[in-house]
């Protein structure tokens, strides 16, 4: 990296720090999305409750955030929701759920909140990103996941819509996505250069073809092993924020982590992110000062073998979200107004009683 590049990066970081100092108190909207019809496994609808029970609201409040908990959305199951093309499951139900979520996220972002959506399965990201884009059309997306979720309704091997949301979001893929029931309201809101994947390690053949043929940026676990997570984040920001600052939407699937850390999820894949890598991603996103919305999805308490596995996965989800809003690994810092900025000085009498003094 050249001296000029280092200088520009340092300057941008200083500008971001100034932005964060000016906005020391985030206004955060938390929206629960207890939805499971984008996949086949029971239990992911309990994800929002598990994450809340792990202390999310208290953690954000302790970080100085002004938290507005919007509660959980209600999603209706559409009767007679038949398969599309003999394979795509629950298209009308998923389409309606995404529409409901899009409206709620749009309201929250429009009211000035940074929006946190608790899933629920990853099909919901079509709704959250669409709603975000209604208020911030120039947004960019960082998609942290073991899977690319970019199959189309014509390439999906499973028929599960949680493996397809990105194909609905990208303008370049619209001639490949048929008009399926339940999605007549939907419009693509991203270009391929607006999204970067991190943590991929389980791609279907069609997904691999799409990523390479359309030149969509991604960093697999092999890339992370070879380059290191620091370099991955630098390249991610160079692409998404290199020319201008713009809102970031982070869509984080808990299965991006190794199953040893996040066992309570529906599609675990061995060889995932470490705790340090995952939290470094969110810490760096926070440091840009540009985070505008977060999805945390696919926590499934029912699939855990023990209550300890539920607790570990939910606690990890809370750490991911909290580090998006300033939680650091440098100590338990809380509200900015409680941070000590002047060290106490020993009194004269105290000093006289002690022959050996160590001065700071």
Curated annotation (Swiss-Prot):
Residues recorded as binding Mn(2+) 1, renumbered to this chain, are 122, 145, 149, 253
Q: What induces it?
A: By thyroid hormone (T3).
Q: What class of enzyme is it?
A: hydrolase
Residues binding Mn(2+) 2, per UniProt: 145, 147, 253, 255
Q: Name one GO cellular component term.
A: cytoplasm
> What is a biological process (GO) this protein takes part in?
arginine catabolic process to ornithine
- InterPro entries from the xrefs? Arginase (IPR014033), Ureohydrolase (IPR006035), Ureohydrolase_dom_sf (IPR023696), Ureohydrolase_Mn_BS (IPR020855)
Q: Give the EC number(s) listed in the UniProt record.
A: 3.5.3.1
Q: What does the UniProt function comment say about this protein?
A: As well as its role in the urea cycle, may be involved in tissue remodeling.
According to the record's subunit comment, the protein's assembly and interactions are: Homotrimer.
Specify the protein name. Arginase, non-hepatic 2
Q: Which organism is it from?
A: Xenopus laevis (African clawed frog)
Lineage runs: Eukaryota, Metazoa, Chordata, Craniata, Vertebrata
């Amino acid at each position: 990296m050249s001296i000029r590049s280092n200088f520009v990066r340092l300057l941008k970081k200083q500008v971001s720090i100034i932005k964060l100092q000016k906005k020391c108190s985030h206004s955060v909207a938390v929206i629960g999305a207890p939805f499971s019809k984008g996949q086949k496994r029971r239990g992911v609808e309990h994800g929002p409750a598990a994450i809340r029970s792990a202390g999310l609201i208290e953690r954000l409040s302790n970080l100085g955030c002004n938290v507005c908990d919007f509660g959980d959305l209600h999603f209706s199951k559409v009767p007679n929701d038949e398969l599309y093309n003999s394979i795509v499951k629950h298209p009308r139900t998923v389409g309606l759920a995404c529409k409901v979520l899009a409206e709620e996220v749009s309201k929250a972002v429009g009211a000035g909140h940074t929006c946190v959506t608790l899933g629920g399965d990853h099909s919901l990201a079509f709704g959250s990103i669409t709603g975000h884009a209604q208020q911030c059309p120039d947004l960019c997306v960082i998609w942290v996941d073991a899977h690319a979720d970019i199959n189309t309704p014509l390439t999906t091997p499973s028929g599960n819509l949680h493996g397809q949301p990105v194909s609905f979001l990208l303008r370049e893929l619209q001639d490949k996505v048929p008009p399926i029931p339940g999605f007549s309201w939907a419009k693509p809101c991203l270009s391929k250069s607006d999204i970067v994947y991190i943590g991929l390690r389980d791609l279907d053949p069609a997904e691999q073809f799409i990523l390479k043929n359309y030149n969509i940026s991604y960093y697999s676990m092999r890339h992370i092993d070879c380059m290191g997570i620091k370099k991955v984040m630098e390249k991610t920001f160079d692409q998404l924020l290199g020319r201008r600052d713009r809102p970031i939407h982070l869509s984080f699937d808990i299965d991006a982590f190794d199953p040893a850390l996040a066992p309570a999820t529906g599609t675990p894949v061995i060889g995932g992110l470490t705790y340090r890598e995952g939290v470094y991603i969110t810490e760096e996103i926070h440091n840009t000062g540009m985070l505008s919305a977060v999805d945390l999805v696919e926590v499934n308490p029912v699939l855990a073998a023990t209550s300890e596995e539920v607790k570990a996965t939910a606690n990890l989800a809370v750490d991911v979200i909290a580090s998006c809003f300033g939680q650091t690994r440098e100590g338990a810092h809380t509200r900015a107004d409680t941070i000590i900025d002047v060290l106490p000085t020993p009194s004269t009498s105290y000093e006289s009683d002690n022959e050996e003094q160590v001065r700071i």
